[in-house]
């Protein structure tokens, strides 16, 4: 009788401990599922305000791009106007207009000589052509028969010498300027063209990298997804498939129902085992 009593007591404690372990397992899974659901809800709530910030960042970058384009257009127009002025000074008629502007500047300051012309050029070759064309003007101003009677004003001397010096300027510029200088004078205009031609090549070199980047990202994500599926084979249930498909509402409902059914089954087992041990204990003690 004592042996039966001890065995029944041992069985009772064994069943109780076994059921407690099972209950702890199911309770842990239930807690984990609830925690995962709370994390998913927080993630969905945090994802909603992000597109507004991204739109603001995009508008800011667009404003900076407008500023860059404005500076680029300003520099391009400045260089184009400089090259146009240089080419105009090389021609005869444009040289005459340049000397007229110089005479207007001479009227403001009478102490300046008659043939002072302010020309801002970018090439040394153009500067040499302008100085070579100015020297005959000065000589013509001094040897002008109308100027022997008295000292002429700079404006009148320049106006009279312009018509006489147009032909001489054409001949002198053609004789003094070698053919290589024409290429040099055209070089400032060619440099922006070369820069513009080099810009599409840079865009073309960047485009294959941009095209290849999404492919690498896609392959990396593909391998990562396979790795996660291989590492977690228990995610092949119907409820987990619904979770991966994006049905978050069905996902939470299915997992909660499964947990409730498993908990009910474990409780039923625990009640049956307790009742069996109690029946045995009463039978033994009575």
From Swiss-Prot:
Where does the protein principally reside?
membrane
Bias kind Gly residues: ranges: 54-68
Would the keyword Disulfide bond turn up in this protein's UniProt record? yes
The family database entries (InterPro entries) matched by this protein are listed as:
MSA2
Sequence segments annotated as region (Disordered): 43-248
Say what the protein does.
May play a role in the merozoite attachment to the erythrocyte.
**UniProt protein name:** Merozoite surface protein 2
Q: Write down the species.
A: Plasmodium falciparum (isolate 311)
The beginning of the lineage is: Eukaryota, Sar, Alveolata, Apicomplexa, Aconoidasida
């Amino acid at each position: 009788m004592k042996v039966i009593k001890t065995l029944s007591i041992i069985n009772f404690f064994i069943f109780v401990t076994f059921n407690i372990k099972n209950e702890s397992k199911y309770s842990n899974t239930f807690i984990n599922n609830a925690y995962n659901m709370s994390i998913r809800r927080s993630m969905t709530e945090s994802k909603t305000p992000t597109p507004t910030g991204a739109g603001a960042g995009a508008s800011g970058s667009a404003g900076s791009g407008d500023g860059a384009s404005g500076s680029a257009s300003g520099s391009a127009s400045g260089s184009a106007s400089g090259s146009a002025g240089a080419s105009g000074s090389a021609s005869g008629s444009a040289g005459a207009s340049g000397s007229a502007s110089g005479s207007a500047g001479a009227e403001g300051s009478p102490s300046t000589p008659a043939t002072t012309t302010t020309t801002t050029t970018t090439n040394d070759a153009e500067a040499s052509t302008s100085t070579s064309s100015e020297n005959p003007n000065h000589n013509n101003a001094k040897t002008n028969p109308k100027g022997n009677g008295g000292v002429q004003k700079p404006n009148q001397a320049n106006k009279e010498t312009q018509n006489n010096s147009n032909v001489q300027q054409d001949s002198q510029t053609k004789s003094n300027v070698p053919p290589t200088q024409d290429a040099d004078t055209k070089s400032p205009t060619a440099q922006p063209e070369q820069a513009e031609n080099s810009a599409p090549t840079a865009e073309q070199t960047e485009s294959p990298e941009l095209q290849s980047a999404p492919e690498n990202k896609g392959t990396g994500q593909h391998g990562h997804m396979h790795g996660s599926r291989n590492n977690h084979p228990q995610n092949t249930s119907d409820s987990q498939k619904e979770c991966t498909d994006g049905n978050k509402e069905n996902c939470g409902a299915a997992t909660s129902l499964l947990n409730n059914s498993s908990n009910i089954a474990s409780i039923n087992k625990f009640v049956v085992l307790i009742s069996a041990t109690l029946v045995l204990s009463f039978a033994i003690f009575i």
